Amino acid sequence: MQGFLRSLFFGVKKIPKPFAPLIEKGVLKEAVRCNKERYFLKEGFDIGKIEWAENKAFFISLAKNYPKDPLIKNLPPSFKTDALILCKIECSKKRPIAFFKAALLNADHTMIAYLAKKNNQIVAIPFKESFKKPILLKHSQRSLLELPRHCVVKIDLKKREISEILGALEDPLIDENLSLSLFDRIKDFSKDCLNLAQHYAQLKASDFKNRINYSHIPFITIDPKDAKDFDDAIFYDQEKRVLFVAVADVSEFVPKHSSLDKEARIRGFSVYFPNSVYPMLPLSLSQGACSLKAFEKRLALVYEIPLDNLENARLFQGVIEVRANCAYEEINHFLSANQSSLDKDLQQSLLGFLEVALRLKKERLKKGFNFNSFENKLYLNKEGRIEKIETQKESDAHTLIEEAMLLANQSSANLLDKHFHNKGIYRTHKEPSLEQQKRLYGKLFDYEIMRPKNMGFFPFLEHALKIAKEKKLEREVSRLIIKSQNLALYSPMQESHFGLGFASYTHFTSPIRRYSDLALHRLLKELLFHQAKGCSYLLEETPELCAELNALQKKTALIERDFVKRKFARLALELLEKEFLGVVLEVKDGVVVGLKEWVGLKVLVKTNKVFKPLEKVCVKITHADLVLGQVWGEITERIKEHVS
């Protein structure tokens, strides 16, 4: 049913018989119109799910995207989080309002909860809706007592029985499974899917005909040091000034409509945790046959990009043999110390392209923006607790890969523009609205960064970061600017990418971990290598596919964020009653303090005192909640001197 409801956003020619009563006499009668022999959802109506946060219900659309998730009004108290509902949307300057109209489908009759004692009885408390009435289970109190304290369980709501035990909430090793389960991420692949993956994994590159042999070219991959799924490799021919970008040809191993394809599409993206990955494809493919491992012949789609004429980039089906799998740290050491065990031709390729990449980046930033994302990498011990946190910043090695990938992605977007008249699978990013811009100006004013009169939004962002660098506030200001942006989205129609400054852009370079790239590969291969017979069919499904991918992208981010929040809450429990230097990050309903010693750990403080953003304080951690993933504390002192 969910597939049918999503199709109403884009128009459906015929209403399937089982759903006809919904349209003719049922809850969808007032919400659906017929236009040019297609049925569409009327303007102002939306279908989606409920997401609870801090006792408020938010609306998550199946296909539409809002700057902020609409707040649901008049929702009946009995509704479960995973129910599909029809809403009327009313736009507002701050946040859209969703008025509940009808329930369409209870997607699942299970719920994640934890066991706790209330009124001398062990009951189940819903994880996402802990404010609701506890669930009394059919199991005997004696049997429930045998389970660990605060045991996390999956409950069959119809039977009021436990269907799965995840483990004790206090056990840090539960966190991966818990975050995945809370957002209904399927963890395991079906037997059919695993068998099919194993079959394709046994095929050799030599089994595939009509491919260009690139195995003489010394490609290199550059990834995080713990990476195992190598999507892309590069080589720069200095003499010809041609950049070669090779990307794993995953579509050869994942037939359209096969169990492999269906399960990859359901996942949409790989989920990454600090010590593990839950891949979009089975490991035999994602870390095996598709991964561009050194000294292994692999199928690849290879771009040859002449840097003197980017419009003449050409895409080929090839066989490659990567010369080296390297980590960013290794390449950075080589670029700074000019010492490496890499072959000379690889060294020359990297040094030659670095010069080009830095120039490309400089030119790109005249129209695009460098968001200076400071990524916090968590290192966990064997018990699943945070051992240390490292802040990772962009380096020359990152620039090398980033600029090469941007060129390949742009080249792919150009093919869509040229051959499909601006239709396909695009990656788009809208400029913030005037309201969003004003809010950012106000927040930066608190940081004593003022917007000069008549300065446009884009020049002001650069101006703000320049001042932030001088004030040593680059991290804080970058965080504010990133928060002010719209989400980048997938679109079936060409739109610009504000952040990058590109008129046209797509995702091509990560087909092992993103279904969007895999789908784009199929479209481009059909166009270039198969007489374009299936292009119209593939294009027809892109509106629905892009809507799915946008929802799955959001879900993946929520899973990863939920995991990190709970890890920080666990860390805070080890630091109770201890005091730390911190800086005020936000002043809203309370004060949010970021710790200097544990970067990324945010402490919520309820206080009647007035604090300003960037004020240096001493904060004591008083409480942490593993269910909400929140940390509370109290400010014990204002620090006058500068905290470096």
Predicted regions and their residues:
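Residue-level detector of short coil/turn "hinge" positions at structural boundaries
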Residues: 29-30, 187, 423-424, 449-453
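Alpha-helix initiation and N-capping motif
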Residues: 2, 97, 159, 173, ...
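Feature marking long nucleic-acid-engaging regions of large polymerase/nuclease enzymes
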Residues: 138, 223-435, 449, 496-514, ...
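Conserved, well-folded catalytic cores of nucleic-acid-processing
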Residues: 25, 88, 103, 107, ...
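Flexible loop/turn segments at secondary-structure boundaries
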Residues: 170, 229, 252-254, 387, ...
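Short coil/turn segments at secondary-structure boundaries
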Residues: 177, 192-195, 212-215, 314-316, ...
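Structured C-terminal cores of nucleic-acid metabolism proteins
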Residues: 411, 440, 444-644
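Charge-lined substrate channels and their catalytic hotspots, especially those that engage the 3′ end
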Residues: 1-247, 251-297, 308-310, 326, ...
